[in-house]
A protein has these predicted regions:
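Non-ligating segments of multi-cofactor redox enzymes
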Residues: 1-514
């Protein structure tokens, strides 16, 4: 057992109002500079829709994530090491700028400098790439906002698989939900596996995935390898960049910028302990519908004395263990089974989870709009948002986990409504979904009236315990045994011998001794 800690996030889609505050603040802090105008580390999509970039969830087109071979092993969908290397100079599956959008501003100066004339001057769009005026804007990061555009285009959404989607093009059957998206900081990141230069790494202390800007060579294979398309190429610097989970804030115990500024208070941050030795086993699960449950088995109970003892023995700080015990992410994902991972079928074991949307249905149910099931709760399967659509997004097509989460949220509402409105304690609904009174009241506190300290439980990092990483700078990415730490082999891709790597630490220590 190799115990590691990860700072995870849960987003409650039941409360997201689509205000884009998270997107704007993230943009202003991290990507408001030349070369990254089109990049949105955090963006809010309206579903159903093809997303950003266009058809980003279609892995048949973009070749992201992992696939399981017949021998039971997984490999990047993009190809093996040799297959990835052959795409270095010509990658046919990397999104182009038109798959995102041509970033633009408006010619505001013309409003002030235009000469006197018959007509009011207008501010025409101007490209932020070449500075030239654009004929018209044809796409954007939130082009499908509030179901913008015709249904025929939005119907290409991959989450409509196994659904008769034609009926949802009719006005009376239409539905909509918001989906904030950011880097998932996966336990099994495919972007790390597809980077030939070894520039992408996952931090052991908090699980945040970062790109070493010194080692990045701009091959852009990580962009193809990421199934969530949350790595962007900076055309100015020639490097790839991605969400850094605001790690300078996380290290000091503060939430990410998107979480801090969220108007709807939908975001929760907390620590999860997991067994790193079980990651490959979980990601290699044969059936895609079982991936969610296998990922849950990777996580460890922070209240288990044996887990605590082993974690301390392996160097996990005490404050991290205590934070894991109070983690809202663990409560929602593991205790209450409300939060689900985004597209577990990609086999990356994502660590940004989502509570499926339920609102607004109470008045609709009271008016008899929802058929009754055998128990107290109405038939969740008859909600306006198709359960199969949510399952395709959050549980690899398995409707069971989605129905369980929705029924538990509905039961919580039924129980709290009976207390506050009717003045009685009706436990029939929560008994039906297998929850206790204590669990439901705690769920209500976290989902409805949580304080700042409840939503964000982030331990400060122990930089004094970090080892000297300087000696690891001479590590490399893809290798055939002839380039890392002085090793050598007969095969060399570039037909030339490589000198042994120089251990800078030894040279420095020797110089200090002299």
């Amino acid at each position: 057992m190799k115990i590691r800690s990860q700072v995870g996030m849960v987003l409650n889609l039941d409360k997201c109002i689509g205000c884009h505050t998270c997107s704007v603040t993230c943009k202003n802090v991290w990507t408001g500079r030349e070369g990254m105008e089109y990049a949105w580390f955090n963006n809010v999509e309206t579903k159903p829709g093809i997303g950003y970039p266009k058809n980003g969830e279609d892995q048949e087109e973009w070749q992201g994530g992992w696939v399981r071979d017949v021998n039971g092993k997984i490999r990047p969908r993009l190809g093996s090491k040799m297959g990835v290397i052959t795409k270095i100079f010509a990658n046919p599956v990397v999104p182009q700028i038109d798959d995102y959008y041509e970033p633009f501003t408006f010619d505001y100066e013309h409003l002030h400098s235009a000469p006197e004339g018959k007509h009011i001057p207008t501010a025409r769009p101007r490209s932020l790439i070449d500075g030239k005026r654009m004929d018209k804007v044809i796409w954007g990061p939130n082009w499908e906002e509030l179901l913008g555009g015709e249904f025929e285009k939005r119907a290409r959404d991959r989450n409509f698989e196994a659904i008769q989607k034609e009926m949802y093009g009719q006005f009376e059957n239409t539905f909509m939900m918001y989906l904030p998206r950011l880097c998932e900081h996966c336990l099994n990141p495919s972007c790390v596996a597809t980077c030939p230069s070894g520039a992408i790494y996952k931090r052991e202390e908090d699980g945040i995935v970062l790109i070493d800007q010194d080692k990045c060579r701009g091959w852009r294979l990580c962009i193809s390898g990421c199934p969530y398309k949350k790595i962007y190429f900076n055309w100015k610097s020639g490097k790839s960049e991605k969400c850094i989970f605001c790690y300078p804030r996380i290290e000091s115990g503060q939430p990410t910028v998107c979480s801090e500024t969220c108007v709807g208070r939908i975001r929760y941050l907390g620590v999860l302990l997991y067994d790193a030795d079980r990651i490959e086993e979980a990601a290699s699960t044969e059936r895609e519908v079982d991936l969610y449950e296998r990922q849950c088995e990777v996580f460890l109970d922070p209240h288990d004395p044996s887990v605590i003892e082993e974690a301390l023995k392996q160097g996990i700080p005490q404050n991290v263990i205590e934070a894991a015990q109070r983690s809202p992410v663990y409560k929602m994902a593991m205790d209450w089974k409300l939060a689900l991972p985004l597209h577990p079928e990609y086999r990356t074991l994502p660590m940004v989870w989502y509570v499926p949307p339920l609102s607004p249905i109470q008045s609709y149910a009271d008016a008899g709009g929802l058929p009754k099931s055998e128990g107290v709760l109405p038939a969740i399967e008859s909600l306006r948002i198709p359960v199969q659509y949510l399952a395709n997004m959050l549980s690899a097509g398995d409707t069971g986990p989605v129905l369980r989460a929705l029924k538990r949220m509905m039961a919580m509402r039924h129980y709290m409504r009976s207390q506050t409105v009717e003045g009685v304690t009706d436990t029939r609904a929560i008994d039906e979904v297998g929850l206790s009174v204590a669990q439901v009241e705690e769920m209500y506190r976290y989902l409805a009236i949580a304080n700042y300290e409840d939503r964000f439980v982030i331990p400060t990092s122990h930089r004094e315990m970090a080892g000297d990483a300087f000696a690891e700078r001479n590590g490399c990415g893809f290798t055939f045994g002839d380039g890392c730490h002085g090793s050598d082999s007969k095969f060399n891709l570039f037909n030339s011998s490589r000198i042994d790597a120089i251990n800078i630490t030894e040279v420095r220590d020797k110089a200090e001794g002299e």
